[in-house]
Swiss-Prot record:
Residues 495-1115 are annotated as: NADPH-P-450 reductase. Induction: Expression correlates with fuminisins production. Residues 16-494 are annotated as: Cytochrome P450. This is Bifunctional cytochrome P450/NADPH--P450 reductase. PROSITE patterns: CYTOCHROME_P450, FAD_FR, FLAVODOXIN_LIKE. Residues 219-246 form a coiled coil. Residues 522-664 form the Flavodoxin-like domain.
Length: 1115
């Protein structure tokens, strides 16, 4: 900070009565004020002394005196270049032994500085810096790939990584030299970087100690400093010599210094000046930016709301693209974050100026010519007269354009002043914006909760011991990131597909249809709330056409009332929901049951049922009912009913394909039309669609979906638990929902998977693909005869992450080369297929990447995939709470599966604690939702809830709500509805009791502030359970909601006897466990009160009013 040997105390005239002596702490003999501040927290100490002695004060070191300035107003005076000029004092003066008379260390009056300044400054103009973007991005990608390959559990030393990044960047951009810091063994720093840190630290230490201490006590440190200074200059001279011997045609800094002439004098830089300035840029150009980036990541982690906003801005601007130089200017909030970081933690402690003549400062303090005055950034940048009472707080909003432009002079001076301002400012800001944007675009940051900020002040200010962890976003793996950074260009492709949904017929009221040979046609009917049965229906239609059948219709089951086709086989695909028909079959089932025997003579049918084993009592109930009722009414069964258990360990597509291959089609008469496949043969997709390039369309393939705009997206949980998120939507005008209703969303594949697919088929993001129907095939919801970008096609229409079916595997076997065929064949063995493909959720894309000699075109790939189906979520808001808006509360599904040997290599897997290699998988819909930020849009459709899952009309009756995790969503909506109804209401509201379970009060206790407010006004009483912190006061020792229900048995019983309604929302296991606790208790109460004669809980539930005990269960 000070140059003790350079400056000596001079007498200051105080004969003018208006002048005052500059205050300051009293110095000690010889040592001066050495003990008045903490060298480990120097800038803060200087600020504290300013609070004691005023905005300008003097401190003494041995025989030299320096003046400190801590106010913006006085700093503005010192920045008047007609009165003061920069003084390269303190550590900069010591650094002259290393960098000589470089731009930062030379006096302004030095002719060497003037020539170098005129030659070098134009090299850092805006357009020149833009031209350096690709080199900057190259190094940043190296860092990101290194982080990704270390995995999410590796603590990253932020300062070390930022130093590697900035050193390698400045070297590549200015002299086309690669230090390759990220490739060094064991992550060690490059010796050049180590030497830079050492000489800067030593320069600072020397500048703050008396000469006798440096020369006689610290002689070893002084000797090391001289050796390292000589070594740095030697290495720089070697770089220059190498360029002279091997000239390159590059318009970079080194070539300019070697050949450019000063426009004023016509002189070039001397060999010594070239070394001085090149070394100056290599040192100053990386240390300061490294400090900026390190503190930036610290502040982002300390302020999660800021981190979220920056990440959302990056996502909005960049989207699924790779970052380009044009993106950088569209991130004003990120730029504001960097400005605010520089305000609070400038990389430099400040800078020196000296008066050009004897001066009076602040109207009353005399300073002599050449007297060092030091502007303390840490104080000037926190001046409350400029920044207000919150000047010490990190608030980037103050640095957005309007606020930044209105700052008074000298309120923000991190890059210095006037003619001596840092010429590398555009370079540093472009590099910093790129680095932060790329990191946040690719990673989520994980804070080290144990870290407390410590920083070290030398010539720069750096955080000490600061680490963080990073987690690839969107479920990406390191290989995916690498492919995304270097994906290929566009190419022609071909794809097999079929007519769009719009071209498919609906059922006609004429059951006999036209004169077409009905035996060569089939009709497919489906009923599904989640979309699974609909996807299977279109899969069957495509498979049938592959075998030569025509498709008479693909329609919902309800549309078959009074119009079931006669003559054409009718295939019905449906599911049960708590024993009830899906929405699309609710009218059909009563109609079918009402028919007389023989009414459906001449109808041929087959039924396929979806179900989930957790609903054991009603598993396949509706499909079996339809199957038996059709037979009762005289219809002829052409195949035994097929079923698929859709629990986690089973795949409905594999079950379905097995059924149609082994049961259905062998019983049907196959016409073997053009391109048809004989029964018993596997249908192998062929390249029968022509694909050409064209303009990208915007096509909506479904009815009933409308566009909603995201207005808020935030995390509700802390790291260490599955993430819970909140999403607020702006809805279209006519979208009228009720509390408890559901919304269907149309998700998209993760950018990671889209990039993988694009890379595999060699497609660019904007490659235009047109799928044409050349063989009258049916599609899986693919757009036909319309140009569409490859990104849209692979992102929005087919599920890339869907587990491969056995039929898919056989297709790959047929397309595989000799090297892969045996390995793929082994996976078709039933046990291996289940254990290594199904249970581990291995996708077709996984298999294609693992076995590169599979010759599969896009035309074969697309028909193998299931269409993307909608997913359902409960609204977590009441419609009148914020009119025109709705909120969703959801868990981001992110889980690990064991890596399959031979499929997931080391680059795609990671090792957990016991050494087991695992692959991270993400839920399609929840990952898609988590990628959305404010301003983005999605397509939604309203789905009404069960008429019983709502609050009773009588507000005086009690209600008991039981939920875990995001099962709280509908209850939040009910409570908002109850809160608004209570405003001004005269009627009495019955008690409301909410049992809510989560992992812990500081982990994922959702909407805790809102619920506490409701409790305060008596709207509800919340009984909590924490699985990870049952000892918390409000959990009362309960880990799960079932524990809390047992503990509150008397309270629950009292409300039940008063007519309470019980609403349960959560996973199937939780709902079952709750019934195991409440069922016997409530049954016993009703038995004693004579309200039931049931003997068992099952019997009691069956007889109970459906509105008294209602479950909303999700899988």
């Amino acid at each position: 900070m000070s140059a003790t040997a350079l400056f000596t105390r001079r007498s200051v005239s105080t004969s003018n009565p208006e002048l005052r002596p500059i205050p300051g702490p009293k110095p000690l003999p010889l040592l001066g004020n050495l003990f008045d501040f903490d060298f480990d927290n120097l800038t803060k100490s200087l600020g504290e002394l300013g609070k004691i002695h005023g905005p300008i004060y003097s401190i003494t070191f041995g025989a030299s005196t320096e003046i400190m300035v801590t106010s913006r107003e006085i700093a503005q005076e010192l920045c008047d270049e007609t009165r003061f000029c920069k003084l390269p004092g303190g550590a900069l003066d010591v650094m002259k032994a290393v960098v000589g008379d470089g731009l930062f260390t030379a006096e302004t009056s030095n002719p060497k500085w003037a020539i170098a300044h005129r030659i070098i400054t134009p090299l850092f103009g805006a357009m020149r810096i833009r031209g350096m973007f690709d080199d900057m991005k190259d190094i940043c990608e190296q860092m990101c790939l290194r982080w990704a390959r270390f995995g999410p559990d590796e603590p990253l030393n932020v300062c070390d990584n930022m130093t590697k990044l900035t050193l390698d960047t400045i070297a590549l951009c200015t002299i086309d030299y690669r230090f390759n810091s990220f490739y060094r063994e064991n992550g060690a720093a490059h010796p050049f970087a180590e030497a830079v840190v050492d000489v800067m630290t030593e320069s600072f230490d020397q500048s703050n100690l008396p000469d006798f201490v440096n020369n006689y006590v610290r002689f070893r440190a002084m000797a090391k400093f001289k050796r390292q200074a000589a070594e740095l200059r030697r290495q720089t001279e070697e770089l220059i010599a190498a360029r002279r011997q091997n000239p390159v045609d590059r318009d970079d800094l080194l070539n300019a210094m070697l050949s450019a002439k000063d426009p004023k004098t016509g002189e070039g830089l001397s060999p010594e000046s070239i070394v001085d300035n090149l070394l100056t840029f290599l040192i100053a150009g990386h240390e300061t930016t490294s400090s900026l980036l390190s503190f930036c990541f610290y502040y982002l982690l300390e302020n999660p709301h800021v981190l979220r906003r920056v990440q959302q801005e990056v996502d909005t601007v960049v989207g699924s693209d790779t970052i380009t130089v044009d993106h950088l200017s569209s991130m004003p909030y990120l730029e504001a974050v960097l400005r605010e970081t520089l305000r609070l933690r400038d990389p430099g402690p400040g800078f020196y100026v000296k008066p050009l003549k004897d001066e009076v400062v602040a109207g009353k303090y005399a300073v002599n010519k050449d007297q060092p005055l030091f502007i303390v950034f840490d104080s000037v940048h926190r001046d409350q007269s400029t920044y207000g009472a919150d000047a010490d707080e990190f608030r980037p909003e103050r640095m957005l354009k309007d606020g930044f432009d209105k700052l008074p002079p000298c309120a923000w001076k991190p890059f210095g002043n006037g003619v001596r301002a840092c010429v590398g400012r555009p370079f540093a800001m472009q590099q910093a914006i790129l680095a932060v944007a790329m990191v946040l675009h690719k990673f989520d940051l994980v804070k080290d909760e144990s870290y407390t900020l410590k920083y070290h002040v030398t010539m720069t200010v750096r955080p000490v011991g600061f680490t963080m962890k990073v987690r690839l976003r969107q479920g990406q793996r390191a290989t995916d990131l690498a492919m995304g950074l270097h994906r290929g260009h566009s190419q022609e492709a071909s794809a097999a597909a079929s007519p769009s949904r719009a071209s498919l017929k609906r059922l006609s009221s004429d059951v006999n249809g036209d004169d077409t040979d009905h035996k060569s046609q089939i009709a497919v009917l489906y009923a599904s709330n989640s979309g699974s049965c609909e996807a299977l229906a279109y899969r069957l239609a495509a498979e049938a056409t592959e075998r030569g059948f025509g498709i008479r219709a693909v329609d919902v089951v309800n549309n078959a009332i009074d119009r079931i086709p006669v003559g054409s086989p009718v295939i019905l695909i449906t599911a049960s929901y708590n024993g009830e028909p899906a929405d699309d079959a609710q009218e059909f089932v009563p109609w079918l049951k009402s028919l007389e025997s023989g009414r459906l003579n001449g109808v041929k049918f087959a039924v396929f049922g979806n179900g989930h084993r957790d609903w054991a009592n009603t598993l396949f109930a509706v499909p079996r009912l339809i199957d038996s009722e059709l037979a009762r009414c005289g219809a002829e069964r052409v195949s035994l009913m097929g079923v698929s258990d859709t629990c986690d360990s089973s795949d409905p597509f594999s079950d379905f394909e097995r059924w149609i291959d082994e049961k259905l089609f062998p019983e049907l008469e196959t016409p073997h039309g053009p391109g048809g496949v004989k029964n018993g043969d596997r249908a192998v997709p062929r390249q029968e669609l022509q694909v050409s390039l064209g303009q990208p369309p915007r096509i909506t393939m479904r009815k009933g979906y409308v566009r909603a705009i995201v207005t808020e997206a935030r995390s509700l949980s802390s790291p260490g638990v599955p993430e819970k998120r909140h999403l607020e939507l702006l809805l279209p005008k006519d979208f009228n929902y009720k509390a408890g209703d559901h919304v269907y969303i149309l998700p998209r594949n993760s950018p990671r998977d889209v990039v993988r697919a694009l890379s595999y088929f060699g497609l660019g993001e904007d490659t235009l693909i047109t799928i044409r129907n050349t063989a009258r095939k049916l599609s899986l919801g693919l757009p036909l005869d319309t140009p569409i970008t490859a990104t849209d096609l692979l992102g929005a229409y087919v599920e890339l992450g869907r587990t491969a079916s056995l039929k898919n595997l056989w297709t790959l076997v047929d397309a595989a080369g000799h090297g892969s065929r045996a390995a793929l064949l082994s996976l078709t063995e039933p046990e291996r297929f289940r254990a290594e493909v199904q249970d581990r959720h291995v996708s077709i894309l996984d298999l294609l990447e693992r076995f590169p000699d599979i010759d599969l075109s896009l035309s074969c790939f697309l028909p193998m995939l299931a269409q993307i189906r909608p997913r359902a979520y409960s609204f977590s808001s009441a419609p009148d709470w914020k009119p025109g808006h709705a909120t969703l509360t959801y868990t981001v599904v992110d889980f690990a599966t064991p890596a399959t040997q031979g499929i997931n290599g080391s680059s795609k897997s990671k090792a957990v604690g016991d050494g087991t290699a695992v692959v991270q998988r993400q839920g399609l819909a929840s990952s898609y939702l988590s990628s959305l930020g404010p301003g983005t849009s999605l397509y939604v459709s309203l789905h009404r809830a069960s008429p019983y899952f709502c609050l009773q009309k009588s507000t005086s009756l009690p209600v008991i709500m039981v939920g875990a995790g995001t099962g709280l969503a509908p209850f939040r909506a009910f409570l908002q509805e109850r809160r608004m109804a209570a405003e001004g209401a005269k009627q009495r509201f019955g008690p409301a009791l909410l049992f809510f379970g989560c992992r812990g009060p500081r982990l994922d206790s959702l909407y805790s502030v809102e619920l506490e407010a409701y409790e305060t006004i008596g709207l509800v009483q919340v009984r909590r359970a924490y699985s990870r912190d049952p000892s918390a006061q409000d959990a009362q020792g309960c880990k799960y909601v079932t524990d809390r229900l047992g503990k509150c048995r008397d309270e629950v019983a009292r409300l039940w006897m008063d007519g309470a309604q019980v609403l349960v929302c959560g996973g199937k296991k939780m709902a079952n466990d709750v019934l195991e606790v409440l069922g016997p208790m409530l049954l016993e109460i009703d038995q004693k009160r004579g309200e039931t004669t049931a003997k068992t809980v099952v019997e009691w539930r069956a007889r109970l009013d459906k509105s008294r005990y209602v479950e909303e269960v999700y899988v």
